[in-house]
Structures are given as C-alpha cells and as structure tokens.
C-alpha cells in the first residue's frame, strides 16, 4: 500500500535550504524534537491514530529521492551539487522517531538523532497526523463545504486582481499549508483553483513536490529551528542570532534573503539586525504578534539605518486568510514590497476545527533551546530555567497573565 507521503519532495522548501547549511557547517549536531497539539479538545483522541501513524512512518522511511527529483533540486540555483549528491544517498531512519500515548488520549512523538535526519521528519509527520485524523471525519458534505469555501476564495482573488493598480507594488500570496493540510490531493486542488482564478496574485507554494508538478515557484528560506540551533552551538548565547544570520549569508551569498524575526521577539531581533544585515537581507518574515506593530517597527528600523524600505520585502505568515492579507498589503504597500504565506486557511478550511499541531526543536547537542515568540502561546521549551535565562539575556519581559 502506498503511504500518505509518496515523495520526499512533499515537504516545505525551507527544509532543504536549512539542511544544506547543516550539512555544510554543523553536520555533527544532535537534536531533539517534540510534538504538541495546542487544541483544547479534538473530535476524538489523537492517541487513536497511533497504530496507523506507525505504519505510515515505516512507509516514509522506505522512500528515496528519484533521479527526476534530484534533477529538479539541482535546477534551483541556491542548491549546491554536493548537497544533491548527499540526497541521492539519503533515507530517513525509523529508529530516530518514537511514538507513544498517555492516559489522557494524547499523542506523544519524539524525534531524536542527528539534525541532518531529525529536521527532515517534521513536515512529513505533521501532514501524516493531519490526514489520518481528518480521514475519519470525511463525508461528502465536508468536501462540499470545502469546495464552497474554496470557490468563495477564488472569487475574492479575482476581485482583488481586477482592483489592483499596475503602478503599485503587487499583492502576492503563496500556499504555506503543507504541515496542516487536509490531504495532498486537496492541497493541489486548492492551488490549481486559485492559480486559475488569479495567476497574477498566486506567487507559488512552499511545497516542493507541488511546485515541481505545477511548474510554479517554490517559496521558503528559514524556520525558527535554524536560528534556535545556534543557541546551543559554539557561540555566546547573546550572539546566537548574529551567528545564525552570518551562517546563512555565508551559505547563500545573497540568495534566500528573508530573515525570520521572532525567535526572541522583534525588539531583540532588531538590536542584532544592524546595517550590515539590513543591507544584505532582502527583507523580514513575520510569524507572531501584531503584524501592524511589527511592520511599523521594521519601517522605523530601516528609516533609522537610512535604507529605502520600498526596496525591502515584508513576508507575513501568521494565521492569515485572504482578507487579513489584503488589509496588511493596503497598509504597507507604499512603504514595502509585501508577500503573504497562507497556510491552514487555504489547505484545511473544510468546516471542521483544524488541528493546531507542531513538532518543535527543544534540545540541540543535549542543551535546551527555546523560542520567545511575539505571541506568548507560541513559546515552547521543556526547560523553564533556560527560558528565564533567555529572557534575561535578551531583555524580554515575562508575558502579562490575563
């Protein structure tokens, strides 16, 4: 039986761009990832899918890259030939993943092993968990409702495309929904439908398999885990963001120039994002906190550095839908180029409450790492002492309790 994942390209581009840096610059790094479901409740306990998940993981770990897939990766100018040679030999190892349950019906997943392996599991496992969960809830009415919502989005994008002023910076969206999609076939249907409705607006997808299949641009640079790893590498904690950005610049020499800002919060990020980085990077990505406040801070920072912000890109990717994205574009279009990565609202808007699931890096080389998100609910670590130390080092206040 073919598994839910049938190609190792069926993941987000940034897994490849981050793994290339890991292979070239710190290949010996060991890491631990842990699964969380942030939903207060689910229709049925996630523990119920444990056995099916184990079967899917076994199938996933049989996959290898095909020559056609490797040729596609080789065609991306920022992917280096030695990395493709490595991927030709690559196979995920099942022994690095443990799946368990607890007496509250929760699903526990731990990935522990070399980062060059562990990092690559994340998107696959999240997509598998989603598809297994929603498979039991699927009815013709669910698909019908999903289609109704999708057609409404397509109609809205047509309206926006017609209203765009060609003399203004364009409104561009991308699919960022692989990790929480309903299923692959639905994700492809969504992208095809929106591309047909508004080809001038749909810029691409983070999913490499679908980018290749549909002939559109694969989108992505870095995730939080890349920057977090530097909290445990051979640099002073205070300098981890600078070290991570320097490492990225060394690898990509001007390509993939969008920096993620919320590992220890926007204010702490901007203290490290000096003139050197501000000139080198094409722009910034927002993934937590108030996007308007965040963008205004970015604008003030570029103004202070005497950089024309209209040459820079703000990418937004936190809980977006088309209306929120369009409103943000209207607010920032005269000051920045903008881009919007829309995830769950595109690929899993079927009428059911989506799963809010994550698989996050919590340790690197045996040392805790953490994210001090601009949204308190997104902060994740298994070490409260380290979290407090990180707050102290970067002068990040404790979030106010409601």
From Swiss-Prot:
GO molecular function: nicotinate phosphoribosyltransferase activity
Enzyme class: ligase
PTM notes: Transiently phosphorylated on a His residue during the reaction cycle. Phosphorylation strongly increases the affinity for substrates and increases the rate of nicotinate D-ribonucleotide production. Dephosphorylation regenerates the low-affinity form of the enzyme, leading to product release.
Keyword check for Phosphoprotein: yes
Membrane-spanning intervals of the chain: none
Assigned EC number: 6.3.4.21
A Pfam family recorded for this sequence: NAPRTase_N
Modified residues (Phosphohistidine): 224
Superkingdom classification of source: Bacteria
Pathway stated in the Swiss-Prot or TrEMBL entry: Cofactor biosynthesis; NAD(+) biosynthesis; nicotinate D-ribonucleotide from nicotinate: step 1/1
Keyword field: Ligase, Phosphoprotein, Pyridine nucleotide biosynthesis
InterPro entries: N/Namide_PRibTrfase, NAPRTase_N, Nic_PRibTrfase, Nic_PRibTrfase-Fam, Nicotinate_pribotase-like_C
GO biological process, any: NAD biosynthetic process via the salvage pathway
The reaction(s) this protein catalyses: nicotinate + 5-phospho-alpha-D-ribose 1-diphosphate + ATP + H2O = nicotinate beta-D-ribonucleotide + ADP + phosphate + diphosphate
GO cellular component entries: cytosol
Known function: Catalyzes the synthesis of beta-nicotinate D-ribonucleotide from nicotinate and 5-phospho-D-ribose 1-phosphate at the expense of ATP.
Record-stated family: Belongs to the NAPRTase family.
UniProt xrefs under PANTHER family: NICOTINATE PHOSPHORIBOSYLTRANSFERASE
Protein name as annotated: Nicotinate phosphoribosyltransferase
Gene that encodes it: pncB
